[in-house]
């Protein structure tokens, strides 16, 4: 089964800053990678699918890139509302697996 390794576990940046979250798959998953945002008491929100396709209504400040085994989520022009935990989700023929999550703290 594919294993998704997500880094860092936590990151803190000021309002207006940029956060980069990385996700590495143990084997190629092509572009079968999604990113989710989760806030307490709310269901996970899909941000990006197929590695780089922005879900409808998601601001372009969120950018996904990568293919194969290495993927990145970049959040630019950080806003207080971006404070959340972010997860990658990789899929292959065995099913889907989530990364361990990254807590984003926005200062300001």
Curated annotation (Swiss-Prot):
Tell me, what's a Pfam family for it? V-set
Disulfide bond as UniProt keyword: yes
SMART domains under this entry? Answer: IG, IGc2, IGv
Q: Does the keyword Disulfide bond apply?
A: yes
Q: Where is this region: Framework-1?
A: 1-23
Residue segments, region Complementarity-determining-1: 24-34
The superkingdom of the source organism is: Eukaryota
Annotated region (Framework-4), positions in chain: 98-107
Q: GO cellular-component terms in the record?
A: immunoglobulin complex
- Chain segments carrying region Complementarity-determining-2: 50-56
Instruction: Provide the alphabetized UniProt keywords.
Output: Adaptive immunity, Disulfide bond, Immunity, Immunoglobulin
- Intrachain S-S bonds: 23-88, 80-108
Q: Which SUPFAM superfamilies match?
A: Immunoglobulin
Show the segment(s) annotated as Complementarity-determining-3: 89-97
Q: Name one GO biological process term.
A: adaptive immune response
Which parts of this chain are annotated as the region Framework-3? 57-88
Q: Where are the transmembrane segments?
A: none
InterPro entries cross-referenced by the UniProt entry: Ig-like_dom, Ig-like_dom_sf, Ig-like_fold, Ig_sub, Ig_sub2, Ig_V-set, IgV_Light_Chain
Question: Other notes on this protein?
Answer: This chain differs from the kappa chain from rabbit BS-1, also obtained from antibody to type III pneumococci, at 8 positions in the V region.
Designated name of the protein: Ig kappa chain V region BS-5
């Amino acid at each position: 089964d594919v294993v998704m390794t997500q880094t860092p576990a936590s990151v803190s940046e000021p309002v207006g800053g940029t956060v980069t979250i990385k996700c590495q798959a143990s084997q190629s998953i092509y572009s079968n990678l999604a990113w989710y945002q989760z806030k307490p008491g709310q269901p996970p929100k899909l941000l990006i699918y197929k590695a780089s396709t922005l879900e409808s209504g998601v601001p372009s400040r969120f950018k996904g890139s990568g293919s194969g085994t290495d993927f990145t989520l970049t959040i630019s022009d950080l806003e207080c509302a971006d404070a959340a935990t972010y997860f990658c989700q990789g899929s292959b023929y065995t099913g889907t697996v989530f990364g361990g999550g990254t807590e984003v703290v926005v200062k300001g």
